[in-house]
């Protein structure tokens, strides 16, 4: 083995990316970018361990994609994400890269590994080819270098270097600050960092997302409860009962949430909003759906349509179907034509037929966010 751990940093918020999906979750065919980058680099060498950092909100979901990596909750900053990851590193050396460096070539990885014992930090750099101006003065561009990742460091030296309140933008800066030895090697233009959304077309290794569709179903049922308002699809219905539930009991929204989570393979509503958590007691279900729609978009999907079946003896649903469609379209951020609402009774059979509650069955269809068309 190499005695090297690979860390791939994927916990950022993509605030400058200007796409509805976070950069680490855009699809390359059927793979999220973080998985594509991790598999690509790990194919170039036999690392002792591979660590992937994730935003806390996406950590459990990310674990669904592979059992071959160690997933670690990222920090508020790049440096904190590295510190969190270093707790799981036992090798002498560590190679750290950013998911934004999507097309790092094999030659860079091999050159880093070949030089691992020659300095405390091995750093790929590029010469500057454009004219450089600093504070209105043109400076000698031969003295300016562009620092890239991945970088390969001595694990212990890096731990010592990051044990400071000072924030560094890369490992070499931190190690240089404690007088560590830095060695520069030739970088690559293919290791360009993806920061802005319009830079996607400059990365030749990225293929467009597939045209696959993903379908999920949801089902929820709630009994009636006195002295409570009834909400269905975010619409307040004039009925004498509400729904018995930990939240406001909007059975339609709860069903849709499960359908959305099912379509992207992210579990169910109870995993995101457990009914044992007091912060969700009496909560407006529209807020819960908003969080799920944000999650769906963040991890690379767009909502195509939903088909909703409300099963109720009472109240009568037909007079409110159009209002429910409008409400759900707004909440799901899709056009009204892509929301279908059906209503049926239980023919006076069972719990629902005795007018003791309402059930809703939902089907949701998703597709990958197509960054190629933006």
Swiss-Prot record:
Pfam families: IspD (PF01128), YgbB (PF02542)
Feature type site, description Transition state stabilizer: 16, 23, 246, 345
Positions bound to 4-CDP-2-C-methyl-D-erythritol 2-phosphate: 220-222, 246-247, 268-270, 273-277, 344-347, 351, 354
Key word Lipid metabolism present: no
PROSITE patterns associated with the record: ISPF
Signal peptide (from-to): none
Keyword DNA-binding (UniProt): no
Site (Positions MEP for the nucleophilic attack): 141, 193
Region spans: 2-C-methyl-D-erythritol 2,4-cyclodiphosphate synthase: 214-374
One GO-annotated biological process of the protein: terpenoid biosynthetic process
Keywords, sorted A to Z: Isoprene biosynthesis, Lyase, Metal-binding, Multifunctional enzyme, Nucleotidyltransferase, Transferase
EC number: 2.7.7.60, 4.6.1.12
Residues that, per the record, bind a divalent metal cation: 220, 222, 254
GO molecular function: 2-C-methyl-D-erythritol 2,4-cyclodiphosphate synthase activity; 2-C-methyl-D-erythritol 4-phosphate cytidylyltransferase activity; metal ion binding
Catalytically driven reaction(s): 2-C-methyl-D-erythritol 4-phosphate + CTP + H(+) = 4-CDP-2-C-methyl-D-erythritol + diphosphate; 4-CDP-2-C-methyl-D-erythritol 2-phosphate = 2-C-methyl-D-erythritol 2,4-cyclic diphosphate + CMP
Cofactor: a divalent metal cation
Pathways involved: Isoprenoid biosynthesis; isopentenyl diphosphate biosynthesis via DXP pathway; isopentenyl diphosphate from 1-deoxy-D-xylulose 5-phosphate: step 2/6; Isoprenoid biosynthesis; isopentenyl diphosphate biosynthesis via DXP pathway; isopentenyl diphosphate from 1-deoxy-D-xylulose 5-phosphate: step 4/6
HAMAP family: IspDF, IspF
Similarity comment text for this entry: In the N-terminal section; belongs to the IspD/TarI cytidylyltransferase family. IspD subfamily. In the C-terminal section; belongs to the IspF family.
Protein name: Bifunctional enzyme IspD/IspF
């Amino acid at each position: 083995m190499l005695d090297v751990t690979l860390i791939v940093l994927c916990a950022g918020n993509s605030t400058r990316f200007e796409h509805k999906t976070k950069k680490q979750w855009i699809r390359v065919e059927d793979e999220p970018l973080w998985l594509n980058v991790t598999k690509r680099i790990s194919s170039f060498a036999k690392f002792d361990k591979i660590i992937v950092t994730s935003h806390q909100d996406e950590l459990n979901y990310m674990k669904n994609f592979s059992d071959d990596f160690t997933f670690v909750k990222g920090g508020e900053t790049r440096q904190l994400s590295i510190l969190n990851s270093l707790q799981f590193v036992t090798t002498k050396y560590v190679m750290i890269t950013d998911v934004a460096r999507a097309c790092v070539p094999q030659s860079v990885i091999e050159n880093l590994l070949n030089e691992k014992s020659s300095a405390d930090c091995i750093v790929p750099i590029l010469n500057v080819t454009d004219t450089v101006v600093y504070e209105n003065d043109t400076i000698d561009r031969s003295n300016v270098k562009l620092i890239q990742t991945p970088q390969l460091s001595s694990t212990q030296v890096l731990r010592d270097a990051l044990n400071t309140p000072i924030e560094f933008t890369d490992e070499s800066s931190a190690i240089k600050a404690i007088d560590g030895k830095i060695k520069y090697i030739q970088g690559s233009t293919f290791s360009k960092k993806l920061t802005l959304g319009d830079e996607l077309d400059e990365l030749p290794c990225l293929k467009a997302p597939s045209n696959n569709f993903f379908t999920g179903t949801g089902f929820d049922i709630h009994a009636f409860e006195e002295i409570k308002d009834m909400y269905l699809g975010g619409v307040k219905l004039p009925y004498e009962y509400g729904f018995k539930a930990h939240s406001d009991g909007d059975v339609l929204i709860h069903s849709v949430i499960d359908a959305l989570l099912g379509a992207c393979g992210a579990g169910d509503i109870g995993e995101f909003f457990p009914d044992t958590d007091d912060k969700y007691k009496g909560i407006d279900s529209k807020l819960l759906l908003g969080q799920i729609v944000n999650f769906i978009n963040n991890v690379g999907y767009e909502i195509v349509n939903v088909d909703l079946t409300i099963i109720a003896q009472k109240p009568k649903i037909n007079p409110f179907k159009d209002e429910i469609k409008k409400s759900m379209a707004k909440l799901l951020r899709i056009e009204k034509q892509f929301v279908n609402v059906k209503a049926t009774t239980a023919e006076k059979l069972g719990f629902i037929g005795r007018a003791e509650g309402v059930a809703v069955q939902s089907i949701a269809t998703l597709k990958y966010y197509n960054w190629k068309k933006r």
